[in-house]
Amino acid sequence: MTSPAVTPPAGGGAFSIALEDRTLAAYLARPAPSAATGSGRHGLVVCHGFPADPPQPNAANRGYQQLADRLAADTGWVVMTLSFRGTSESTGNFSLGGWLADLKVAIDVLLETPGVDAVWVCGFAAGGALAICAAGEDPRVRGVAAFSAPADFADRATDARRFVAQARAVGVIRDPAFPADLEAWARELREIRPLNLIGKIPPRSILLVHGANDEVVSVLDARALADAAYAQVELRVLPGAGHRLRNDPRAVALLIGWMDRQGG
């Protein structure tokens, strides 16, 4: 795929990534000028998960934008968030392979952003799983932090029609004729497996954070991912925490600490 010719706003803010078949909504947070160190800054792409509820205008966007602003302010990094196809103001329809392609575009965009010297990725739930996959496939990614990430998506593929119906209900499949090929759509759910790719990331940095009481993705998934990376990970299990860790102050503190420990 040819990288899109996109220049995010110099001072940060919302912008669009226009591609041949879709437009992706994105947001860039920059630290205050006083936080700059050296000639370049580290960059982080933050990925959201699969929505649990029908969309409320810009609600999820605001939450991730606020997280990006905080991370940039606290760490001095340039932080980019992306709305995957079918979510928020991004066009298109959900497919797992499509979301992974969107993340790869975001990595390209951030790497080409003036002032960014290297890129890490971070994600929550499905976004964390895709962040692992992207890091496993792209050696330019310097490290990954994944929160509540599933080890694979095989359970979704077992009843693809039901999952399509769920995706329609939460608004990430908008075209009534999509997917044209249900089996090909479901095949991506079986073949895109963080469990198969996380072992390609070390010695690059990996942070896995999971809630001990996660009611959606078992904490066993985090332990399986850690084992698949030959235990070359920082694994943190948060007592009493459930699935949604984006607003858990302990999870955010772990992310900020991990970012601060990344080398030049």
Residue ranges and their predicted role:
Residues 1-39:
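N-terminal cap/lid segment of alpha/beta-hydrolase-fold proteins
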Residues 3, 10-14, 24, 138-237, ...:
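The alpha/beta-hydrolase serine catalytic core
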Residues 32-74:
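Short, surface-exposed "cap/lid" segments of acyl-processing enzymes
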Residues 51, 84-88, 151, 242:
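Alpha/beta-hydrolase active-site loop signature
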Residues 63, 93-114:
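Alpha/beta-hydrolase active-site loop
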Residues 82-96:
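Glycine-rich "HGGG/HGxG" loop immediately N-terminal to the catalytic nucleophile
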Residues 105-165:
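Primarily recognizes the serine-hydrolase "nucleophile elbow" in alpha/beta-hydrolase
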